Amino acid sequence: MRHFLNALSFAVVLLPATLCAAQIQGKVIRVLDGDTIEVLQEQQPVRVRLLNIDAPEKKQPFGRWSTNQLKALLAGQSVTVSYTQTDRYGRVLGRVITANGTEANRQQVLKGAAWVYDRYNTDNSLPALQREAQTQK
């Protein structure tokens, strides 16, 4: 019994971060590039970096195209952002879900508008989506 309680205590401490995720709900008021948006929550803009992906900067090849793909998906839309942390720039690192259930992070990869950020990726299904996008190009 003692071992069971120790194991249970250990498991509770190590619960996945997604179970403790916070949420932001609001309207996308700005798309900065292919992996960064601003969401208006309670009259305050919150900068959000799409988790697990990276996209070209606007001035890099395909940067404007990537930005336009994200604009087409999110501009003016109501979204829910699930997150567990912020980055060193104060941006929320999150999964962005539209009102109809589309996850923007995954869509950007599937369209070929962003790639999996291997160094920080925590979504094991994204590499397969990236391979699928590469075979369709």
Describe the function of each predicted region.
Residues 2-10, 18-137:
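Small beta-barrel nucleic-acid-binding modules, primarily SNase/OB-fold domains
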